[in-house]
Amino acid sequence: MTTTPKSEQDRVIIFDTTLRDGEQCPGATMTFEEKLNVAAMLDEMGVDVIEAGYPFASDGDFEAVHEIAKRSKNSVICGLSRAAHKDIDRCAEAIKPAERGRIHTFLSTSPVHMKYKLQMEAAQVYEMVISSVTRARNHTDDVEWSAEDATRTEFDFLCRCIEAAIKAGATTINLPDTVGYAVPEEYREMFRKVRETVPNADKARFSVHCHDDLGMAVANSIAGVQGGARQIECTINGIGERAGNAALEEVVMAMRVRQDKVPYWNRIESKMLTHASKTVSAATSFPVQYNKAIVGRNAFAHESGIHQDGMIKNAQTYEIMTPETVGVKGTSLVMGKHSGRAGLIHKMEELGYKLSRNQIEDVFVRFKALADRKKDVYDEDIEALVDEQLLHGQDLIRLKSLTVIAGTHGPQRATMKIDVDGQLRIEEAEGNGPVDAVFNCIKALVPHDAKLELYQVHAVTEGTDAQAEVSVRLSHEGRSMTARAADPDTLVASAKAYLGALNKIVAKRQRDVRQDAPAVAVAG
């Protein structure tokens, strides 16, 4: 359990309708096996009621609800049904194997629904409420009745229908904001007034079911609980009709994090929330938006330098819950163009590097340049930058600029500027391909007789903007020297790697002859 219950009166039942309302979202259809997997996960994570489907809709829905009812270990298994007796009977048959089963029947009560959808008078609707709930109660003691479009229903008629449903045997009364029309204060007051007005309101548990058409499904759900409801109907990732439903992960964590304002508890194991999100996303092929609350990729990610600095000092500066609480391994300091020195230093320390102040400054300058060119900077990118600094930070020969002209006609041409121990040199050369042109340019700038033994390229990370890491091995006077370099531009990385190997030859010869290397090794 995620919280210690204060009293049964403060307990909120979590009613998950991912497999019913969630699957009604266009494109979110799940296979039989996927439904079973999702249901097993919901059962394991502590969902009180699983609305497994609408058995009358199809044989496939019936079979899924029936099989889930067989397999459930902890949750109440619920089936949805219209007010028609044949629907209710089919639903009862589907949930029959469940140790604890529920029939959820509904009927529209708003003027617009009664007139245009049902084409019935209020008196007819009232009688059908009694008839349908009575029929359902003949099959099971656990019956939920929903007043579809409750938030647009005339208050007096709504109260009459609720009273009749409870008298007929309904144990849960659901008042949905079917079209996401309500605002929190209005929804809270509706529950408060209904519970005050309906004489037998204390004989049933009240439930919220909110849609997100105005982006207030979660806020309205919490408001309904504050107004006296003790069941929240919701879905994993908030999937559902049109703009979706209240997201289970959000209502659960709102109750956990804001106990001061929302002092209620539930049975959900919050450490499974991220896993649940990924499971449903995979089953429905609906990606979770990056900035989705609680379970989005960026929910515990920080790129801003100011935020990263605060997080390094104390995570509570910018996080109101720990990532581990919802099943995320830890906070992510995302390295990008908004990151500062503190974030970069922290990341380098995480990766096991300890650099001097001057080395850090050099890496930071190159990191900023890389971040401006690359959408995402990964750990591997940071490692490549640091490795290049450690390997080539004291190099005698440094690349200053490179321009390559390439195309389908004529030879490729490279123009390069380098710094040789403080002396700038510039040259251009042609080649059979852009890499050949770059290497010929280096040979013109730094005449040498080293032979190229290896040239190898691979991507440091994924994506078209990934850094290329190039390895070059040169042989000279019986010795082989290998160097590698990384850059988003493969040709720049190639030039840096070649120069890196050349620098190793220079350094080796300098040690061997014990004299000034520039005049001996890079003359010309």
Curated annotation (Swiss-Prot):
Pfam families (UniProt xref): HCS_D2, HMGL-like, LeuA_dimer
Any one GO cellular component localisation term in the record: cytosol
Keyword Amino-acid biosynthesis part of the UniProt annotation: yes
InterPro entries (alphabetical): 2-IPM_HCS-like (IPR050073), 2-isopropylmalate_synth_dimer (IPR013709), AIPM/Hcit_synth_CS (IPR002034), Aldolase_TIM (IPR013785), LeuA/HCS_post-cat (IPR054691), LeuA_allosteric_dom_sf (IPR036230), LeuA_bact_synth (IPR005671), PYR_CT (IPR000891)
This protein's UniProt keywords: Amino-acid biosynthesis, Branched-chain amino acid biosynthesis, Cytoplasm, Leucine biosynthesis, Manganese, Metal-binding, Transferase
UniProt-recorded Gene Ontology molecular function terms: 2-isopropylmalate synthase activity; acetyl-CoA C-acetyltransferase activity; manganese ion binding
Co-factor(s): Mn(2+)
GO BP term (any one): L-leucine biosynthetic process
UniProt-listed SMART domains: LeuA_dimer (SM00917)
Region of interest called Regulatory domain, as start-end residue ranges on this chain: 398-524
Listed Gene3D superfamilies: 1.10.238.260, 3.30.160.270, Aldolase class I (3.20.20.70)
EC number(s) reported in the record: 2.3.3.13
Binding site for Mn(2+): D21, H209, H211, N245
Its biological purpose: Catalyzes the condensation of the acetyl group of acetyl-CoA with 3-methyl-2-oxobutanoate (2-ketoisovalerate) to form 3-carboxy-3-hydroxy-4-methylpentanoate (2-isopropylmalate).
Subunit structure: Homodimer.
NCBIfam families: leuA_bact, PRK00915.1-3, PRK00915.1-4
Family according to the record: Belongs to the alpha-IPM synthase/homocitrate synthase family. LeuA type 1 subfamily.
Protein name in the entry: 2-isopropylmalate synthase
Originating species: Rhodopseudomonas palustris (strain BisB5)
